[in-house]
């Protein structure tokens, strides 16, 4: 794949996780909740296979879904935007970010007031719309800043744009960010500007997040280091504190986020387009607006076909979420839920992946699809979902042809191998048996020795097939000796295609194979590097 479009439907949870009660959640299910609303529309997502995901039996399934689908369980100890996105990018957080159910401690506020020159109001967990109703008038009269938090790890500053201009509010947020470190390192400091008069205050689009930097290397960092594009649409750049981003596209609504993502399809680039659609969470989940959430989902569902239609041959679309925010559970906080995973593209096999542990699965899968070695703390699904590409098809067919020349009068088992060199040449080999048994040479070594004898020392891929009576019959992995010989010239990352040959149609059997690597076949192996000085 050349381009991956990763779209986070912010807060679209699909059912409570087993540990939800530890996070204060019970009977939460964001998607099921909005599916009961008359505004809910589901046609495009149904065709992709959303109703086929584990736990979504209340939705109609699809006999032949277009996407590979599954359900992801979060491993991090949290249910907020920052930790959710960090895990999607490859980092699992074993400890939750600090929260302040009783407000921020005295030493934090005193330092903040000293450095800003302004006193503060509130200092309690509050709804963003309710806090300006309660304190907005006093703020306008006194100039005191409205500081509040929520169940998430956030330090929020609300201020009227006529009292505190946006640039000044952002400076205050930077001051707060510099103070909130160490044990008080909240996930985000958020600017919450508003306008209007008492009784009719309205929050504006000038929100800005000042996030804690990720504690380790992310998928975004890896792709940027490798020279690939990382285009951040919506609040992605804010969430990652600008790290690992090559392009930033600001948006103010789901509609604008979808529009900018669609425009990116027309560009030529290699890498990742990472979009967050925040309205689901900010406008509807937190505000307990089931109808609004359902309507926003319907708008996305209606938009989706225009995106799918414009996708190119080597594009991959990944749809997922970062946490839940059930709009009908009676409170305004995020919810600890599974999130959906849908992967669509012309190179994707539409399989049901079941339930997988770890949002970091997304980072590992995207990385492998883009040819990056990064895996983070996730396990890639790419080998399970990728359809054979032209290079793989050619290599498997070459191995199959080599199998026809096998000399195996004693075992009756014919094996063929094809080794792809770094310069694009294919070297084939078959097993050659001997009456004395020990001089027998396997197909893999035959192919490798042929290549090495012609001066080739660098390889990109290996394919192996086998069977009896020259009929493919199951997987034939390399023997131990072959694995050691291959290790002499090949890295543990060498892709290995093990032909399964389960199809009764010989023309199709060559396309049925299992992807693995030399390292997976030969873990903790001994190589020449251990003998070098």
Regions found by a protein language model. Name each.
Residues 428-530:
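Zn2+-dependent cytidine deaminase-like catalytic core
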Residues 341-343, 412-421, 497:
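Short beta-strand scaffold segments in enzyme catalytic cores
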Residues 1-387:
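Feature captures the catalytic ectodomains and active-site-proximal regions of enzymes
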Residues 415-434:
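RNase H-like nuclease fold core
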Residues 334-337, 410-414:
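Short, flexible loop/turn motifs enriched in small residues
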Residues 393-408:
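Short, basic/aromatic recognition patches
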Residues 387-397, 500-506:
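Short, compositionally biased leader-like segments
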